């Protein structure tokens, strides 16, 4: 399992609805920021992946709203990749406020797809090389 913590960020006024709560559609943006930065922390980027002819469309997205995040809250997003990617990669998210309260959880599943044919493909070896050591450590603990 690999987990990455996105640096804390403040909820901006533009992120909220009339009630001062984070607008529900913005959580998907928070997820994307987390995914991109988690992969970047591994030394892997979406830009390089796309340049190599592989895309990662979202296949499934789920969200659970436990408590509202509000304007000016300081949020942290923990991003976890719970299993070694194959033809798909799963990201799990936990969003907390500055008091550490769990406000929101979510999960996205993305698939690896060849840009030229649109067909599914295996996870790129470069990504596996970067992430596999985290899963090898887990095997050693059992």
Give the positions of each predicted feature.
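Alpha-helix boundary/capping residues
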Residues: 34, 46, 56, 134-138
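HotDog/MaoC-like acyl-thioester-processing domains
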Residues: 3-7, 70-71, 81-142
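Hydrophobic beta-strand-centered segment that forms part of the acyl-chain substrate-binding groove
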Residues: 38-76, 80-90, 103, 111
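Generic structural detector for well-ordered beta-strands
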Residues: 8-12, 64, 109
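Catalytic strand-loop segment that frames the active site of acyl-thioester-processing enzymes
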Residues: 1-38, 44
